[in-house]
From Swiss-Prot:
Keywords: Cell membrane, Membrane, Protein transport, Translocation, Transmembrane, Transmembrane helix, Transport
Protein name per Swiss-Prot or TrEMBL: Preprotein translocase subunit SecG
GN (gene name): secG
tRNA-binding found in the keyword field: no
Keyword Cell membrane: yes
Topology, Extracellular side: 56-59
Cellular compartments annotated: Cell membrane
Entry membrane topology: Single-pass membrane protein
The protein's role, per its UniProt record: Involved in protein export. The function of the beta subunit is unknown, but it may be involved in stabilization of the trimeric complex.
GO BP, sorted A to Z: protein transport
Segments on the Cytoplasmic side according to the record's topology features: 1-33
Assembly description: Component of the protein translocase complex. Heterotrimer consisting of alpha (SecY), beta (SecG) and gamma (SecE) subunits. Can form oligomers of the heterotrimer.
GO CC annotations, alphabetized: plasma membrane
Family stated for the protein in its record: Belongs to the SEC61-beta family.
Source organism per UniProt: Methanocella arvoryzae (strain DSM 22066 / NBRC 105507 / MRE50)
Amino acid sequence: MARRESSGGSGGLMSSAGLMRYFEAEESAIKIDPKTVIIAAVASGAFIWILNFTYGRFW
């Protein structure tokens, strides 16, 4: 039978360091409500559509 390798030692430290790095990045990230993003996208699309209707050509 094959021997099972132990996952102790540096494996746990690397895992913990990765989690700490993730949480540090999460704290410094800009937090925007998803509804705000959707509203901004719809407003931008409507604005571009109006500009295209006013100044652009129709296909």
